[in-house]
Amino acid sequence: NMGKGRYGLEELRDIRKDYEKELNIQSIDYNWGDGVELGNKPKYIIYHHSASSNLSSEQIHDMHLQRGWSGIGYHFYIRKDGTIYRGRKEEMIGAHAKGRNRDSIGICLEGNFEDESITYKQMNSLVKLSADMIIKYNIEESEGHKDVYNTLCPGKNFDIKEIQEKVADELIRLREE
């Protein structure tokens, strides 16, 4: 649980704007299909893997359109080189985790973590992006897709506990800056 008091999120809100700039999030001009809904109220972060490598966020967008969705289902996509791409706008209801699409931020990492590992640069970006979302939305909980749905995603080499610890450390580091 990442409750309000624990990291002094109020103080952190002031530095968040600069912190988000550092993340250098890339925006793509997606062509959205019908049915994009606003009104996402994030309380959770849900982590995913793309299950394959060398996929751009545009390719994922096209794949998700072909599934009959309005476009890329995730709010963020992190490539192996650590670059963060915006998917859906944060206020858009996601299409990434059944039962959690209306109250979460979906973050997907490029790769298949059943048989490969998160790159150092991906981990770095993931930790910072997660910390930023926690500060922004006072996120209560972060979990892997498999924690909320019957799936292998985000894979056995995605260590949710390690990531939660790194994010907690990052929030503490930010407070002490």
What are these regions (language model features)?
Residues H48, C108-L109:
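Conserved beta-strand segments of the P-loop GTPase G domain that flank and frequently precede/overlap
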Residues G94, K98-N101:
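Flexible, solvent-exposed short loops/turns enriched in glycine
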Residues N1-K43, T83-I84, K89, D103, ...:
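Basic/polar, cationic surfaces and motifs that engage anionic cell-wall
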Residues G33-E90:
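Secreted/periplasmic proteins that engage bacterial cell-wall peptidoglycan
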